[in-house]
Amino acid sequence: MEIERINEDTIKFYISYLDLEERGFNQEDVWYDREKSEELFWDMMDELKYEEEFSPEGPLWIQVQALKHGLEVFVTKATIGGKGEDGFDVTLSSPDELAEEKIEKLLEENFNPVKKEALGEDDTLEFILEFRDFEDAISLSRATGLENLVTKLYSYQGKYYLNVEFPENKYDESNIDNAVSILLEYGLESNLTGYMLAEYGKVIFDVPALKQIRKHF
């Protein structure tokens, strides 16, 4: 498992599916077994205690994302009047004292995937592309087949990232695969999320980013 300190208030975990299996879990356990999900979460927090100076006490905001080869988990300390309204109190040293409804909230809102058949028309798939440099973003803006993509360009920690959204009512799997294959000719798939970029990055070009880049460069 990899642990990365994003900033003073946010920690990112990345755990591969192979690592999950070595720890005695499988993907179905994590998504659908509440006790297994809870066990994995506390294992991660225990490991964090020894590797980073990050106290998980108090309200936390947790985001879990399923990637192709593993899970990415962001744990952010909530602040009063901010994310604290949506967070919940966690005390690492005594998880058994947590209220049952708080554990269920964690598992239901963050560890349970939404089934495709339950998705509404407004649901959107997200892809984050990391550019090696800005010239690659300019080159991508001139590529064909991407004219109607919903894109936003961010700068974050000295790098450029393109947030691409695929509304599920407009794109099927084949369309998405074709678009992603073109995108990957100009950059790399990033483990960052749209939330992280919106929260901590700087918007360089808002929607539609590629059209604006092509216009100005």
Curated annotation (Swiss-Prot):
What are the GO MF terms of this UniProt record? protein-macromolecule adaptor activity
Q: Which InterPro entries match?
A: MecA_C_sf, Neg-reg_MecA
The residues that cross the membrane are none
List, alphabetically, the Pfam families matched: MecA
Q: Which cysteines are joined by disulfide bonds?
A: none
PANTHER family, A to Z: ADAPTER PROTEIN MECA (PTHR39161), ADAPTER PROTEIN MECA 1 (PTHR39161:SF1)
Quaternary state and interactors:
Homodimer.
The task this protein performs is described as: Enables the recognition and targeting of unfolded and aggregated proteins to the ClpC protease or to other proteins involved in proteolysis.
Domain characteristics, as noted in the entry:
The N-terminal domain probably binds unfolded/aggregated proteins; the C-terminal domain interacts with ClpC.
Give the family this protein belongs to, as stated in its UniProt record.
Belongs to the MecA family.
What name goes with this protein? Adapter protein MecA
